[in-house]
Amino acid sequence: FERVGEIESQIWDANGHGKVDGVIALDTIVLQRMLALTGTKVTTPGGDVLDGNSTSDFLLNGVYKKYTDPAQQDATFALVANAAANGVFGNIGKVNIAKLASTIKSSVDEGRIAVYMANDNEEAMLEDFGFAGTVSSDTKVPETGIYTSACYGGKMFYYLASDIDVGKGVKNSDGSITYDMKVTFSNQLDSAELGTLTDYITNGGGFDGSLHFFVYLLAPSGGKISDITTEGTFYGADEY
């Protein structure tokens, strides 16, 4: 995430907003958890009430169902972001510290929060506390990265489900350890709902309701990925 933060900072500055000290990224689940902790509720221009239960689904999917005009979507996002920030920070003093710490820790562990600081010393501290969004370099506790990104427009990633199964390690004659890993992706959109969605969500055309995406596999530190097999439609692979 350090590189992402650097690029985002440069984009912000290049667009005339000035230099920033850092960049914070969090997903809609974190926002929903913070609203729940602080008892904050946000009402959208269309009358939807976002709270500790409904926020993530609305921001990832509901807003696109309700508003077909991107300008309306952007206005809703801006209002929600402003109201949520004011509500959360305005009520943060009333929150149980232990619950707040637990929520932040679990969100960081799940990769839902990442922070970048332009100051090298501050960035090093973030890395020590697990906030920097770095890839593990610990060869004794190997981590394999699995990342996805969409090939086309639309908002179909809301319907993407994934499951990862890591087998028990098998020690090889050279002392290395091999792990079998199975990654399963599935499309959770059913035909009944598909008929109610706009092309803006489903991609439209020949891709209507289907999921097309890139999968990036990052080998663990000191290790490698081998013997890849696939099922379903697969368009090939490159190694970097």
Q: Where are each of the predicted segments found?
A:
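Amphipathic, coiled-coil-like alpha-helical scaffolding segments used for oligomerization/assembly
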Residues: E2-L37, G87
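Lumenal/extracellular ectodomains and adaptor appendage modules
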Residues: F1-E6, G39-Y240
